[in-house]
């Protein structure tokens, strides 16, 4: 499965680890993703999605309506 958040669209970014000696090593920065089961009240069913930590915070504040609209 891809490492992309369903709600926010966050995906891996590429950059450099820089040492004290200023050596650059290419690296991949992964988003903070979690696989969650979320109850969608409108459809009366559980949905399994990959969400970032920020997306979980958005859902807890605004509810699952935004997520249900994206999954249709």
Curated annotation (Swiss-Prot):
GO terms for cellular component: ribonucleoprotein complex; ribosome. It holds the Pfam family Ribosomal_L28. Keywords: Ribonucleoprotein, Ribosomal protein. It comes from the Bacteria. InterPro entries: Ribosomal_bL28, Ribosomal_bL28/bL31-like_sf, Ribosomal_bL28_bact-type, Ribosomal_bL28_sf. GO terms for molecular function: structural constituent of ribosome. GO terms for biological process: translation. NCBIfam families: L28. Belongs to the bacterial ribosomal protein bL28 family. PANTHER family: 39S RIBOSOMAL PROTEIN L28, MITOCHONDRIAL (PTHR13528), LARGE RIBOSOMAL SUBUNIT PROTEIN BL28M (PTHR13528:SF2). This is Large ribosomal subunit protein bL28.
């Amino acid at each position: 499965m891809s490492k992309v958040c369903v709600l926010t669209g966050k995906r891996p970014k590429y950059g450099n680890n820089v040492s004290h000696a200023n050596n650059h090593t290419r690296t991949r920065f992964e988003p903070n993703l979690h696989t969650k089961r979320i109850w969608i009240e409108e459809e009366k069913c559980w949905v399994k999605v990959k969400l970032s930590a920020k997306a979980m915070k958005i859902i807890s504040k605004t509810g699952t309506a935004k997520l249900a609209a994206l999954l249709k």
